[in-house]
From Swiss-Prot:
Xref: PANTHER family: TRANSMEMBRANE PROTEIN 144 (PTHR16119:SF17)
Bilayer topology annotation: Multi-pass membrane protein
GO MF annotation, one: carbohydrate transmembrane transporter activity
GO cellular component term of the entry, any: plasma membrane
CDD domains from the UniProt entry: ribose_uptake_RbsU
UniProt source species: Staphylococcus aureus (strain COL)
Gene: rbsU
Transmembrane segments: 5-24, 34-51, 58-80, 95-114, 121-138, 153-170, 177-199, 212-234, 241-263, 273-292
Record's protein name: Putative ribose uptake protein RbsU
Alphabetized UniProt keyword annotations: Cell membrane, Membrane, Sugar transport, Transmembrane, Transmembrane helix, Transport
Family as reported in the entry's similarity comment: Belongs to the GRP transporter (TC 2.A.7.5) family.
Protein's job: Could be involved in the uptake of ribose.
InterPro entries: Sugar_transport
Length: 293
């Protein structure tokens, strides 16, 4: 692995690792966050399409790319709602675990991954380890009823949001276009969902006139940077799909730690140790699910 490939492979660490923290730092409600983030992603995607002349898909390729982006928009709205309940440092490991679980199960039952009994035993064991790791990251010494209730609500929300993230990753598999070509219509699908959600919240306030909404465009740049560098990293002449995926998953570590330290989402020393162990379990088990394909 060259230095250039490694640096590109760690791009998602920066983009996706800082995205939830930046979005939370700017504040606002989920409606402000999703509109700003998706507009930022769309701006990034338009510039990228112009610079690379990547073309624009049509027909079913366009439809599935739009559906993919719409799925992400739905999933991210739900995730932002979970941030309100438990903070990004607790929500991110859980949503990452659910996404790994969903992608792996889809790969096994729809795409024929993990052939043979031995691979399936290893794979499903790894999924159990991922869930154990996620549970460890949200463990708390304080057994307050309100905290437990908020955590349960957040987990349910994130489980629902996984359907959107699953669509985000699964829909492009029905197309004949590469990730770079799909990026712009995906961003359009994200914005469509965000705008619809914005209009659904118009009775409370007009989110399109709130300055926080447009400040959140910066958070969208972080997400888009992570997505772009992942697409490049996954190319065979760079890191390849398996290594690129594993490098991208390190973003959950940065997202969790920046949430704790930058957003002051306090954890005790014991909670920190257990959280770190949980994150390591998630990363190691995620690596296993990739290499047994």
């Amino acid at each position: 692995m060259s230095i250039v490939a490694l640096l590109i492979g760690l791009g998602p660490l920066i983009g996706w690792g800082f995205f939830p923290t930046v979005a939370s730092k700017f504040g606002g409600k989920p409606v402000h966050q999703i509109i700003g983030a998706t507009v930022g992603t769309l701006i990034f995607a338009i510039i990228l399409a112009v610079v690379t002349s990547s073309g624009f898909p049509t027909g079913t390729n366009l439809l599935f790319a739009l559906l993919s982006g719409a799925g992400w928009g739905f999933g991210q709205i739900i995730t932002f709602k979970a941030f309100e309940l438990v903070g990004s440092s607790r929500a991110m490991p859980v949503t990452t675990a659910f996404q790994l679980l969903g992608a792996s199960l889809w790969g096994v039952f729809a795409l024929g991954n993990w052939p043979g009994i031995g691979h399936k035993i290893i794979g499903f064991t790894a999924l159990v380890v991922i869930l154990i790791g996620a549970r460890m990251t949200v463990w708390s010494e304080r057994k307050e009823a309100s905290n437990a209730k908020n955590l349960r609500r957040a987990v349910v929300l994130l489980l629902i949001g996984e359907f959107g993230y699953w669509l985000y990753s699964a829909a492009p598999q029905a197309t004949s276009i590469d990730g770079l070509t799909a990026f712009l219509p995906q961003a359009m699908g994200m914005v469509i969902v965000a705008v619809i959600y914005g209009f659904m919240n118009m009775k409370a306030e007009n989110p399109f006139r709130n300055k926080i909404t447009w400040l959140q465009i910066i958070s969208g740049f972080f997400f888009a940077f992570g997505a772009l560098t992942y697409l490049i990293s996954a190319q065979p002449n760079m890191n390849g799909l398996a290594t690129g995926f594993i490098l991208s998953q390190t973003s959950v570590v940065l997202a969790t730690l920046t949430g704790i330290y930058f957003l002051k989402q306090h954890k005790t020393s014991k909670e920190m140790v257990i959280t770190i162990i949980g994150l390591v379990l998630i990363l190691v088990a995620a690596s296993v699910t990739v290499f047994i394909k």
